[in-house]
Amino acid sequence: MANNTKTNPKGLDVVIQNMQNLLYNKLTTLWSIELNGYGRCYPSFNQEQNRKEIEFYSGANEYKDVLYAEENKFFFTAENEIERVGNSQFKTKVELFFIVNVSEIYPNITHRADEEVRVDVINILEQSSFATIGSIVIDIDKVFSKYEYIGTDDLQPYHCFKIVLDTLDYNINNQFCN
């Protein structure tokens, strides 16, 4: 499992990669599980399956569908309008998705530990200076409402949820050097 980062991101992708690195480093330590972290992923239309999907650009014009892979993961999308707030300063909403096996994260808890998982993520995000939490979506029909996913479920041991984040003002010229 890996933290799949962009090489030398700019602007909004710097904000996303900073959150991605923070979450990946803290959660892999806290949960002691294999976890895949993805930065900004992109909607695409799969003509063979006749559905809108979420894909991660893996390089060389190749994309990876992030929803159907069997793994613990989180990823971001940024499909909202980007608002200009000043010279080179912008803000937007970013969606952060989690698909995890709660039994792997908390094997000694006998009840469904979905709330414990969300609390861990929220506590880490609240330490961040990159965004604020706008809302948390746990209804599976609403988590992936923009996408036509059939058969995606939220039954034990799996848990899917989405956090809508409001980015703090960021400079579009910011760069992140790996």
Where are these regions (language model features)?
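Small/polar-rich, solvent-exposed N-terminal microdomains that initiate assembly or binding
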Residues: 1-86
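Viral structural modules
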Residues: 5, 10, 172-178
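Hydrophobic beta-strand residues in large extracellular and virion-surface proteins
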Residues: 19, 23, 96, 121, ...
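Acidic-leaning, charged glycine-interspersed low-complexity segments
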Residues: 34-39, 112-168
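Intrinsic-disorder/low-complexity loop/linker signature
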Residues: 50, 87-88, 135, 155
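Oligomerization/assembly interface segments of phage tail-like spikes and tubes
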Residues: 86-104, 156-171
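Short conserved micro-motifs at the rims of enzyme active sites and ligand-binding pockets
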Residues: 87-88, 107-108, 176-177
